[in-house]
């Protein structure tokens, strides 16, 4: 399935605790039987997310690379993506048949975006626990990502969030760009995200 342009590179961003690593895990497990998959994780001072994915058996350890960005995680996915590009080059060399590489950013805010040199497709993850107003606050993560994932929908009643309001605001802020609701802990919404990647990413 490898494209002539190399593997599809999917950037996964979002605030701390929104569910980025959970999404990466679920996507790896959902796609690894059909596609050759690898992951690059970004953490500020540790490789905790990479270790977590290996521990959860999302992929074998040779397919997961953790990079330590230091300081500001935005720089490693936007202004100077060289550390991530080096990790991707290493994966491509080690596993030449790769179809998909997920690049999980460090915890960031609504202003974070991926450099087009780094990611072909971007997914931005937010959580209903952050508040009903998050979609209408905008920011590049909300408005410019190829897919917005609104996670932890099961917790909406407990944090007094109206999912209909979030749905309406997300649609308004994103124009024609799609968004999905998910409960990643239970795997809800994962199939929709995989279908999006297959259609939008040309897999």
Curated annotation (Swiss-Prot):
Name listed for the protein in its UniProt record: Urease accessory protein UreG
Species assigned in the record: Allorhizobium ampelinum (strain ATCC BAA-846 / DSM 112012 / S4) (Agrobacterium vitis (strain S4))
Domain of life of the native organism: Bacteria
Keyword line: Chaperone, Cytoplasm, GTP-binding, Nickel insertion, Nucleotide-binding
Intracellular or extracellular location(s): Cytoplasm
GO molecular function ontology, one term from the record: GTPase activity
One GO BP annotation of this record: urea catabolic process
Family matches, as CDD domains: UreG
